[in-house]
């Protein structure tokens, strides 16, 4: 058995031809979890050989538009194809706050198209199967596959002014994957990452660019994202074997700029494996690269 972790999008709100909006696909056998759905997620899933009807659930970390702009496309396309596959509504896992109303609104946006399709092909309007949970201050179970092999925990992360923001910990028979969502470096993600095999974490070069962004709106934006140097320190303290960087601020467009991300993480003291993410990068568990028997779950 293997579990794969595929980055369906590593970008930010600014559009990029190379990077779709944020998203991660975690797959174990026939269980497929999509975490977030930024712009072009549906197309990246198609490139990865994944159809919307195959998704076991969509997990939302928070409702910033760059993370949810393709939710409508996923839900609607799954509905359009349902007469072929019969898999029913898309399960959506999210905090029970603004998410239910958000999902309801996007499902009604294409009202004319829905009316036409219901008259001719579909059995009824598009729906989702909501799995809403209260914002948890400690890692809390929020979803489990029907086969019982894949379990998901969530915890609140620090992305204020966004209050309803969480990270996820996905456990399969092959190992543990953590997806931070958008957050500062924080104790909550550190706790979520203990004994994880792979941590997919957002990354912002705040320290390196501090003078450049001073007294600009970016100074505020950077304050609620994860500084790469601080992230390296946190990952080393927790003993993360493999750190995968995504939601890259700013977008690296050359090998030298990719190397700068790696250097920042090393400057923070991290000695494990680093992958600076790009769209459709895939990590397989059990890992093909042994991070060393002393790293996993080490508290320093």
Predicted regions and their residues:
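Binuclear metal-dependent hydrolase catalytic cores
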Residues: 1-177, 257-290, 296-299
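Cap/insert and terminal regions of metallo-dependent hydrolase folds
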Residues: 167, 174-176, 184-278
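Active-site donor-binding acidic/aromatic loop of nucleotide-activated sugar
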Residues: 180
